[in-house]
Every structure is written in C-alpha cells, then in structure tokens.
Amino acid sequence: MEIIEQIEEWRKRYSNWQTQHRSASELDKSYPFVENTRSPFTPLRRSLSMLNLALISSAGAYIDGTESFDTDAPGGDLTFREIPTGIDPSDLLFAARGYDPAFVNEDANVQLPLARLLEFESNRVIGQLNSAFWSLCGFIPDAASLVELTVPKLVERLKHYEVQAALLVPASRLCHQTLALAARGIEQAGIPTMMLAVEREAIDLAHPPRAGFYRGQFGSVVGRPNWPEHQRRILDEALRWIESASQPGNNKLAVELESQVEAARGER
C-alpha cells in the first residue's frame, strides 16, 4: 500500500500550488492536502505493559545550543532530531511553524509528554518509554519528499531501537498530515502506531492507521498546560486503543465532558 495514494497526481497538484504560492509562509485553502482512501494496519501483539513505546513529536523540539529546524524552507525541513528522553525540558527549544508556541513554552508536556509517559512507565501502564524520542518540525508542505526521504530514515531508527509501538503527536494542522503519513510508513514496516488528533478533516483525508481524536487546540494537543490529569486521561485513552483496535480507524476520545466538569469544579 502506498503511503500517498496516486502520488504522481498529488505531485502535479502540489507543483501547481507551489507556482502560485512561492512566497507563502502559511497554508491557504488551496493547498492540496493528501487524500488517501485506505490505511495500513499492524495489530499490537503484546500488552501495553510489556512494550517499548516511542514518542514522535512534530512540534519542532531541539536541544538548546544545537542547530534549529529551518522554518523558512519552502517545502518544509525534512530532517529530524533524535533526543534522549531523559533530557531536562528546560534544555529544549521549539522551532514553531504553523502553531502558536505559547502553550508549549508554558508546559512542554502539551506537545512533548515525556513526564506523563515516564509516569506511565513507573505505573506499568507501558513497559517502557524508549530511551530516545524523535522530533520533527511538522510544517512540511512537500509531502512526497517527506515520505520518500524522511520516513524511511525514521523507520530505520525505530527499528534500531527495537521499538514495538509509536505515539505520534502533531502540533499544527499540516502536522496532522505529516504525522499521519509518517504513521502509515511506520505501520507498513510492522510497528503499530497511535496518533493524537485535534483536526478531524486532516486525518479523514490522510488516513493514519489509528488516530485518537478530541476537540482540542493546535499547540496543546496532549491537553491543557499545567493540567496533568487532563493530559493523563487523553494519553491513557489513546494508548489503550492501540491494544484493543482490530482494524484501522479513528476513535473519538471521551475526554471533553469530564474535563469541562473538572474545570468547573476547579480540579486542575
């Protein structure tokens, strides 16, 4: 199964869009989002409490003092960073494009939930969080180059670490497409994935193998800043669906009503 169905047709649409939007720093309604009709699927063959889980974020995290992502690249920056999960969040910076970094600068867990996932490891919700996570700047309009150049290298690194499942967290609308395509490539390589989502249309078009959707905000996809319980609930429900899913699809996370009640009570 192709990561981008009818990729040559998509290239033509993208080339036409590029010709008309050479200086565009953001997307408009004419951008040719990838339209897939089917999804690859790899079932999880072990329980959450026994697996090595990888985190993939498209919020543009990089280590302070190292090279940033190129947020001016017309087709997007096709590189990724491999970062130790034990890093102090204060040592990270975010090259934000396509989303407001205010929330992630307030609480990195809203896009990079290392603290929450390490809690899950301690509580044996997951076997372990992989010792490295992967960071992209997910504003990548050139989807064809992404799947041909970036995704194979990312899959190679996941296999090197013997990752058994991957959680993908987008930051912007275009990030939803970027990580949906990455998830398709990872799943084709035999590694189950789960993608969080707050933009329904993007995942309906790109067809990631599994997506947990709720009506959240770009730049705060794992939950509201400084509200650990909200973040835990979103992650817990999404991850447990990896275990139970028997076919590809999108699942609406039942986190909104409970969160509204908690907020009204001041339980944050």
Regions found by a protein language model. Name each.
Residues 1-268:
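Metallocofactor- and cofactor-centric catalytic cores in central/energy metabolism, strongly enriched
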